[in-house]
Amino acid sequence: MAIDEDKQKAISLAIKQIDKVFGKGALVRLGDKQVEKIDSISTGSLGLDLALGIGGVPKGRIIEIYGPESSGKTTLSLHIIAECQKNGGVCAFIDAEHALDVHYAKRLGVDTENLLVSQPDTGEQALEILETITRSGGIDLVVVDSVAALTPKAEIDGDMGDQHVGLQARLMSHALRKITGVLHKMNTTLIFINQIRMKIGMMGYGSPETTTGGNALKFYASVRIDIRRIAALKQNEQHIGNRAKVKVVKNKVAPPFREAEFDIMFGEGISKEGEIIDYGVKLDIVDKSGAWLSYQDKKLGQGRENAKALLKEDKALANEIILKIKESIGSNEEIMPLPDEPLEEME
């Protein structure tokens, strides 16, 4: 439907005035603006990258990763840092919990020599540092670990029994209002790690769980990832890792509610090789005959752990199977669910 000529002139004049005051591009017609592809940073997990719909977490957006204790939240975040650094990105880690294990981060592939780290004393200090480095335009990814540890200064300075109702929620709300536009402009990804709490006096329907820091983060986050430990991985009765399940509970850049599963091995992080085997078997790319696993004419090994060890050594073969998996699934198809149980018995 054509717009009236007088209205067109009025709108054009208004756009010129806005461009003069706020800079060119402050107000544009969507039809005149080229639609940009959403860039992403890989999570280090094949299944989660596929579940997110764009190959990883979106750049220039706020991401929330939450779950129970020891579910793999920090591990997943460190993998994202490692993937960002592999592509020349500059990353920062705001360690509000004062619990960053540098040696573990290095084992996951993080370039710790070039990782910017801050261990702030208060929530205000953490968020001021976050805003300053983001506005610099030189940062590609910032991880805040965690929202629960962003303690307001008034709470730290007060006595142990003082009540500070809603103080942290107001702090988060104020910070997110200030930082969201800057993140988009600077194309900086911000990941908040968050913890779970139980709702007080929860009765009736709905989940009794909630995340810390109020509701602002739930609204401002473009992607929210729920990660849970679902099983223990054992080899010869030795506990060697955990099986994790992730659900994309909110996604503004692709369809939400997709899920993925992967192994988190102690001291090693996410097992890409385990995902290759799981998806390969599900998609009939990897053959499973009894305990033996094979790809085309090549034997991968007897049992899942042996096959994982071979793929870990043969990177070219692993990358070849990954390519086949991505081609088989296709970028526009629903993610195929993994088997209910991994290929070897777990407790």
From Swiss-Prot:
InterPro entries: AAA+_ATPase (IPR003593), DNA_recomb/repair_RecA (IPR013765), DNA_recomb/repair_RecA_CS (IPR020584), P-loop_NTPase (IPR027417), RecA-like_C (IPR049261), RecA-like_N (IPR049428), RecA_ATP-bd (IPR020588), RecA_C_sf (IPR023400)
Annotated keywords: ATP-binding, Cytoplasm, DNA damage, DNA recombination, DNA repair, DNA-binding, Nucleotide-binding, SOS response
Gene3D superfamilies: P-loop containing nucleotide triphosphate hydrolases
GO biological process: one example: DNA recombination
Any one Gene Ontology cellular component term annotated for this protein: cytosol
Pfam families: RecA (PF00154), RecA_C (PF21096)
Keyword Manganese on entry: no
Compartments, as annotated in UniProt: Cytoplasm
Coiled coil stretches, renumbered: none
Binding positions (ATP): 67-74
GO molecular function: ATP binding; ATP hydrolysis activity; ATP-dependent DNA damage sensor activity; damaged DNA binding; single-stranded DNA binding
Family per similarity comment: Belongs to the RecA family.
PANTHER family attached to this UniProt entry: MITOCHONDRIAL DNA REPAIR PROTEIN RECA HOMOLOG-RELATED, RECA
Functional note: Can catalyze the hydrolysis of ATP in the presence of single-stranded DNA, the ATP-dependent uptake of single-stranded DNA by duplex DNA, and the ATP-dependent hybridization of homologous single-stranded DNAs. It interacts with LexA causing its activation and leading to its autocatalytic cleavage.
Name of this chain's protein: Protein RecA
Organism: Helicobacter acinonychis (strain Sheeba)
Classification lineage: Bacteria, Pseudomonadati, Campylobacterota, Epsilonproteobacteria, Campylobacterales
